[in-house]
């Protein structure tokens, strides 16, 4: 090698870059393997659930949670790629010199030792492809690409060597075709080769470049180097480079190999640089900067030119790192997107399942109550309406009498052959005529009475039946069993229509209605005829008159009400029976839903969240590197906080290191990280910049999660000790309420609002931090978490909602009003945490100080009310606080008039 002493930084840094790639690739491969196993398990569990519980869950919550096949295949290809350094060049001498420079030793012959020139000057060059791999012992062999080793006597086998013999590099004229295609495998015990393989392409006279690169299209991640020994590239070489770009869509690092005369004066752009820029083979902005090009997105990566071989490491190492990282960043971004998408689906489905578990029993109970109210109301109408109905029938008959007589006189009989002069007919025909006249009267009377009866219960149909049908429709949809409960629901709706839509019963042509009409007709007194009369209009009128007078309004009313009650009772019983069947179906479904909900909360979501944390942390360390820990800022129950001067272009930062002791804590931390990372940025919350998993924490004895977040000036505890004026304290209270309201609006509970979890900037504006206990309500398991003084009584029962944050704010507001960090007397007297909890559950609260403003005291009392339902909503607390602040702080002379500091 020309300058072996200069190869140190290049070898060291390049080996480190490939080592980091391989280490990160192992982590990525492990995460991908566990992700595939997770989704396979979800799919199997889902299939087993469907097979044991019928079709209920077949179209249920977990069908959309899957690993898209094309994403999985793409990621499998990425993690399966081995890093390669591909060396191309204008001629074999330039390639060999670049290889020697990279390995730091003169392994390949140069100059006269290498034989004749290749390319345009020496067309007889027959140097074959070289492949460098790692091994414990140095050896050379010929092998067909991707196949088997050839038994061939090489010159290197005949004795000791330091430089590969020229005869072994060249294809001999007498070799058979198989040996002419074989590549020379050189095995070395070398640090760089432990991390990556190196391939030197053959002379173009031996094999065209596109054929030589064909084996590199799959399963490798190439770092492409092109050695340039001339001032510019020829047209054939540019064409060759175009084929390289078509075969392998990766950027190329061009390396100028020094020749005897200096090609260009120092500090000037070379002709080669201008040519490469014009051909869009390198980026014009990057130039030949010794520091390397800035980070670029994978799709926008460009080649680079290194014009100084002695300073090659300053160009090649950043270039190699960029190529290696870009693919891994893309892969981790894709994998994390799959994790986050499915995790969000899990959380949303947990909300849906929790709501289903809460609302379905209420809907069933509501349906039962409403039907009972409807039944009672209609039965009351049937019982009290009989006398009214009798009067209504009499009034109806009186009002309709003349019209009925007129219609009867003009009635045209059916199925009776009438004579032209209305002569007397047989007794049989006369009976038919009388029956038709009676039918006319009964039908008209039925219509009139039915319309009036319907109007009397119309408001009940609108109030009850519509609501019942909507409830039934909702219950039907939530069963997920169209073959079973859908029929029951439809039957229930048919019963409702038949029983309660009164006009349908009266107006339909059903057998029930015909029976009803027959019963009414039996009330009419039979008319006997001695001699068959002449069927004239007067006769028809007389028959109708007698029929109307023979009707008994009392019996008719009694019959109608009796029918109404009978149908009502039977419908009520059928409804109750069908509702019980529907409830039984829902009971089994809800049991399975609750089991699935528990699995989502306890197993599925936490496991996926851990995979998401790992993929996101891997992406962050690829993009921004591992953060440097500064001085310790503080310690908490679950971690240590350090200063971090700069990370990801943000400074200063705070770094919280958490060492989860077991899988449960890992999963909890991962879920909490997901909730926090998913939150939109808000000025009242401390920003979380990213995370890194440190596998070497504590000298490699444990694994720590490093959470990098926004650095603020101090916490509220320190601020109160230092002294804050009233206006600042009230503004802090407003800021905290605004932050809690935002969290609640995102469906999250903080569960640990306290002085040390409120940070202040240099203007003493507050931000909420430490979302360690932050969770959506649907994902809570009822665990007892928080700081004892700020914990609401219901937290000890495990059943609570977001009002626990209102309680905690009430305690925090007490401290803000006192202006000190001194414990309330009721809490200071407690000798242990258990005694404190007992007193809080019994109703012990902070005392009122003489300096407190009345409105402030009322607000904090309302916030820490023992009954969660009696605590004010934060939407009410915020304007109340603003009103207090306006009243107490508008006039600077009154800032301390109504509320004095007690410290």
Swiss-Prot record:
Keywords, ordered alphabetically: ATP-binding, Cell junction, Cell membrane, Coiled coil, Cytoplasm, Developmental protein, Kinase, Membrane, Nucleotide-binding, Serine/threonine-protein kinase, Transferase, Tyrosine-protein kinase
Main location class: cytoplasm
GO molecular function: ATP binding; protein serine kinase activity; protein serine/threonine kinase activity; protein serine/threonine/tyrosine kinase activity; protein tyrosine kinase activity
Localisation: Cytoplasm; Cell membrane; Apical cell membrane; Basolateral cell membrane
Active site: 752
Matching PROSITE patterns: PROTEIN_KINASE_ATP, PROTEIN_KINASE_DOM, PROTEIN_KINASE_ST
Enzyme class: transferase
Any GO CC annotation of this UniProt entry: basolateral plasma membrane
Domain Protein kinase, residue spans: 627-881
Any one GO biological process: negative regulation of apoptotic process
Reaction catalysed by this enzyme: L-seryl-[protein] + ATP = O-phospho-L-seryl-[protein] + ADP + H(+); L-threonyl-[protein] + ATP = O-phospho-L-threonyl-[protein] + ADP + H(+); L-tyrosyl-[protein] + ATP = O-phospho-L-tyrosyl-[protein] + ADP + H(+)
Protein name, UniProt field: Dual serine/threonine and tyrosine protein kinase
